[in-house]
Structures are given as structure tokens and as C-alpha cells.
């Protein structure tokens, strides 16, 4: 099993790997909308935070020798489901930019807080 770390994405802030690659599958850890260089949230709006989280995920997938075209399942956590439409727009833009024609399975859930 390959353990994936990349200096271009936000470093893990706890005892976990950015991604692991068992048997050819790349499984990534959750990615917040933080700029990996500044270590801070990119913006207060959820669309830009979603775009940054997906950009971070792209960096980790690339470091694992994978891409967005190989994503089979995504789980998205938001603090308010009223943000659903903004998240969807940013997510759809990401998939289009990555050349993904058939979106992966996905779940979205509201949580009380995010780290």
C-alpha cells in the first residue's frame, strides 16, 4: 500500500495520511477550503471554499498518480444545507474543468462544525 504525501497540498493536521493507495485505488482524506500555502481559508463564501477543497483534492490525486476522472464516490460536508446550490455549482465546474463527463456517486451531509 502506498502512502501519499504532497508538499503542494495542505499537510495532514492529525494522525492520518493525505491519501492511501491500496491495490491501485487512491483514497483521499477530507479536504477543507484552505489555501495550502497560506494555511488559511480562501474566502468566506462556500463556492470558493468548495473550489479550493477540490483543487487540494486534485493535487493529492495527482501525487497518487490519479485524477478526478478516477473518482468513484465523493462525500461532501457542509455546515448549512442552504449552501447546497453553491456547492453544486462549484462541484460541477470542477468536474467540467477536469473533463469528467459522468459524475461519480456523491453524498452531501450537514454537520454542526468543520475543523
Predicted regions and their residues:
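N-terminal presequence-like segments and the immediate start of the first folded domain
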Residues: 1-73, 78-115
